[in-house]
Amino acid sequence: MHERLKELRIERNFKLKEVAEKLNVTIRTISRYEDGTREPSVEMIIKFCKLYDVSADCLLGLTDSY
């Protein structure tokens, strides 16, 4: 999932700082989600899905369709 998080952020032209502000977490937290050293909670996964306008299946890498 961590690769997908970074891929979606870059595709949507968001900077780490923007995502962190929108999700009310630190830049370091987003960075750790993206590099795989930390796993997001279910609540955070839902927030990512809403922010990036994708399904949970897409975010989790179960499907490629947005």
Kindly label every feature range from the protein language model:
Residues 1-11:
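A short, Lys/Arg-rich alpha-helix, primarily the initiator
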Residues 11, 60-66:
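Short, charged recognition helix plus adjacent turn
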Residues 24, 43-58:
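DNA major-groove recognition helix of helix-turn-helix/homeodomain DNA-binding modules
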Residues 34, 52, 63:
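DNA major-groove recognition helix of helix-turn-helix
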Residues 14-32:
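Short alpha-helical DNA-recognition segment
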